[in-house]
Amino acid sequence: MPNRPNVRGVYLITPDEPNTQRLLLRTAPLLGSITWLQYRNKQADAALRLRQAGALREACAAHGVPLIINDDAQLAAQVGAQGVHLGEDDGDVAAARALLGEQAIIGVSCYDDIERGRAAAASGASYVAFGAFFPTTTKQTTRRATPALLQQAAELDVPRVAIGGIAPAQVPALVTAGADLIAVVSGVYAAPDPVAAVQGYRAGFAAQRGKL
């Protein structure tokens, strides 16, 4: 059976940071308060991605945090990451599962499309991600997901991730609608105090489903 974890909390995604040491310094203080970390760097070449993913894998292992690689199942296998996140043009779940194994965490971007969510769940995805819920500077998109979509996606029986311009104050409503994980990039990394920012996101879960 594919891995469909029972999870909730902050799903942190890394920014496009070219300096590996700085990426580690920015990320390490946050690892004790997040559920998953996704390595995403759209500006890096293959060599830098390998170095950064390997360094983050070691840091995550020290904190017991699963590392998910964005868009690249081969890189996930190479560094021993726990999973991969697949976008619209990043391959299929079956191929990633064959490469990474039944216990791998394989997520799929479903944007504002419940049918894509149904297809992902049927193919064995570990989780589905919907968004953007709000305007975001991290990724240009005109697609907008809604809390109603999260509610509808309960039928999929897989964890639901909400992503896209989400501020801490917006977390309780999304959790109430069914979000298991809140994915965030700039809301944490661009905050004046990233550690406090993570706690702000966590507090949104505590208000709705009991303390994390």
Swiss-Prot record:
GO terms for cellular component: cytoplasm. Its EC number is 2.5.1.3. Gene3D superfamilies: Aldolase class I. Mg(2+) binds at residues 71, 90. Signal peptide: none annotated. Pathway: Cofactor biosynthesis; thiamine diphosphate biosynthesis; thiamine phosphate from 4-amino-2-methyl-5-diphosphomethylpyrimidine and 4-methyl-5-(2-phosphoethyl)-thiazole: step 1/1. It holds the Pfam family TMP-TENI. Binds 1 Mg(2+) ion per subunit. Condenses 4-methyl-5-(beta-hydroxyethyl)thiazole monophosphate (THZ-P) and 2-methyl-4-amino-5-hydroxymethyl pyrimidine pyrophosphate (HMP-PP) to form thiamine monophosphate (TMP). This is Thiamine-phosphate synthase.
